[in-house]
Amino acid sequence: PSGVMTPTRWIPRIRKGAPAPSSDVFSVWEGAPLLPRAVYDRAGGWGAPYFYAHEGIELAWRVWDTGHRVLYAGDLVANHPAIDPARHSYYYRLNARNRVWLAKRNLPWVLVPFYVGSWTGIQLLRSLRNRTGLGAWFGGWLAGWREKPGGRRRIKWVTVWRMTRAGRPPLV
């Protein structure tokens, strides 16, 4: 309500652009998803072990796995304080841990190293500009491999193909 521009991190597309256009997406903002209860139940609901970050990616992937699509409705407004989450070290730790968990819980095993590897590369490139949080990030990355992330429910190869055809292979 303050008139401040939407942070691009809340636009769930690789090519962010303007927030207004609606499109198929592969993650949802955890604060305001809207879907039929039957689809939510078929998708397995929220990924409770995450605690912070990536539950929305998992829910979106699993909705795609039910044969449905996930739509970002750019014309809807959800108000939330635009506070930089990187102000806390747990942001880095949980993002890294949960990326690994997301892959371990949902992807066919052969894709897990590609997904985690691509996000590791992205984080290393980001750290060239700003090393803040890199230690916490690697701590979370290691925890993701060491800890059990809860139940595994692999998405089907046909879902990987549908997501790829829709513009977002589950590798990035």
Regions found by a protein language model. Give the residues of each.
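Non-catalytic, C-terminal membrane-associated alpha-helical segments of glycosyltransferases
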Residues: L94, V110-V172
